[in-house]
């Protein structure tokens, strides 16, 4: 998990530790131990960690011991990040070699009955989501003085819940499961409930991730292209998922353009009629080109370029890019102003790394800003991958701008 503000990355390890590496020098900076009794499965940074206003990094860890841990570390005095001119983070200024001085194990969150598979902090509220092999999703609210309160236990999945992720600008949570489905959750008055079920995958859905809220990879040059971009702006960020069925799918929301979720013009999927319903309609937009031969465990959607990277059991890392359809084809949609034509896009595989971790499976891939001396621009990105070989590898796309 790359830090949201500092040039560091945290990795979860089977030896019950979390290792923090510099993205400037690629050196090991910290080895965080002592919080869990079994292997650590997942890590996640609090989105405002290390900002000048807060001055504190907060890291959550999910473990095979069925607990989640919250770790805290102050990044220097007066709320300022302790960094040198080359963006290297000094983790030893105040703490020496004493790991307990660096990272404080603030609180343990118990409640799940078996291993925690994934966890994620909300970027819009003081909430943390965790999911588990016990088929449940828990939502925790952070209070003062290292206290967390359980605000929801969601148990509608019929299999292990593999992943949770938050919408970048709304209090909307996505979860994916061994039951082949994706569920979206919202708060309805005082209770959290399922607002959409995304079905279509033919196997375990290993990972889900929302599109960034700000990237502008596509530029409109025609009226039809601008209509598509306007439609996407109204719908908000899309969702990408990957599965045992060898597919990567992109899902989009049908925006509610009338108050209280009234039906839109044109065909619409049937839904249960409620007063003040939280239900949303999400539809499959496209499937990316099939490049993998075995289960796809991880996808990551770049918040800068809009590219998607995938990896999995076959040891491949594949990068995809969305472009305007080469044949300039359009499709028709129904709007309040009648039928309109909008442009189409297509996804193209632009890079592939085979045997990226030799003969081993790849567990996770993620985009991060490039911070080392070789970076060519402030927006250049790297891909970080972890595999069953116990290694963390870093990749660049030298041939692509």
Model-derived segments and their meaning:
Residues 18-21, 68-73, 137-141, 164, ...:
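WD40-repeat beta-propellers
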Residues 27-30, 79, 104-106, 149-152, ...:
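A structural motif specific to WD40 beta-propellers
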Residues 1-6, 43-56, 113, 118-126, ...:
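Loop/turn segments within WD40 beta-propeller blades
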Residues 12-15, 61-66, 73, 124, ...:
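Conserved strand-to-loop turn within each blade of WD40 beta-propeller repeats
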Residues 72-97, 141-146, 186-190, 252-278, ...:
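Short loop/turn segments immediately following beta-strands, especially the blade-tip
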Residues 33-40, 46-47, 90, 100-102, ...:
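WD40/WD-repeat beta-propeller blade N-cap
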């Amino acid at each position: 998990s790359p830090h949201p503000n500092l040039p560091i990355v945290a990795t979860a390890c089977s030896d019950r530790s979390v290792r923090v590496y510099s993205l400037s020098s690629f050196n090991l900076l910290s080895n965080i131990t002592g919080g869990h009794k079994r292997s650590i499965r997942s890590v996640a940074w609090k989105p405002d960690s290390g900002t000048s206003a807060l001055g504190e990094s907060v890291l959550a860890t999910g473990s095979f011991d069925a607990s989640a841990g919250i770790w805290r570390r102050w990044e220097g005095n007066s709320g300022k990040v302790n960094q040198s001119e080359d963006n290297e983070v000094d983790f030893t200024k105040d703490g020496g070699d004493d790991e307990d001085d660096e990272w404080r194990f603030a609180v343990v969150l118990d409640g799940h009955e078996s291993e925690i598979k994934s966890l994620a902090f909300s970027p819009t509220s003081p909430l943390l989501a965790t999911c588990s092999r016990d088929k449940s999703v828990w939502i925790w609210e952070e209070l003062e003085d290292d206290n967390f309160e359980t605000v929801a236990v969601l148990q509608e999945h019929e299999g292990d819940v593999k992943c949770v992720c938050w919408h970048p600008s709304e209090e909307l949570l996505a979860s994916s499961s061994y039951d082949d489905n994706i569920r979206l959750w919202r708060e309805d008055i005082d209770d959290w409930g399922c607002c959409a079920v995304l079905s279509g995958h033919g196997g375990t859905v290993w990972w889900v991730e929302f599109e960034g809220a700000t990237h502008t990879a596509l530029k409109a040059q025609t009226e039809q292209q601008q209509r598509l971009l306007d439609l996407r702006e109204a719908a908000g960020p899309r969702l990408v998922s990957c599965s045992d069925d060898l597919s990567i799918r992109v899902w989009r929301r049908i925006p509610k353009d009338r108050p209280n979720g009234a039906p839109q013009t044109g065909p619409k999927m049937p839904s249960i009629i409620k007063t003040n319903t939280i239900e949303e309609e999400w539809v499959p937009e496209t499937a990316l080109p099939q490049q993998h031969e075995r289960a796809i465990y991880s996808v990551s959607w770049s918040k800068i370029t809009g590219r998607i990277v995938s990896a999995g059991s076959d040891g491949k890392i594949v990068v995809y890019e969305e472009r305007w359809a080469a044949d300039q084809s359009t499709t028709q949609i129904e709007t309040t102003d009648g039928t309109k034509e909008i442009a189409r896009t297509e996804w193209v595989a632009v890079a592939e790394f085979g045997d990226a971790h030799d003969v081993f499976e790849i567990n996770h891939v993620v985009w991060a800003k490039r911070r080392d001396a070789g970076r060519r621009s402030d927006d250049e990105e790297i891909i970080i991958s972890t595999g069953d070989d116990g290694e963390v590898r870093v990749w660049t796309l030298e041939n692509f701008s």
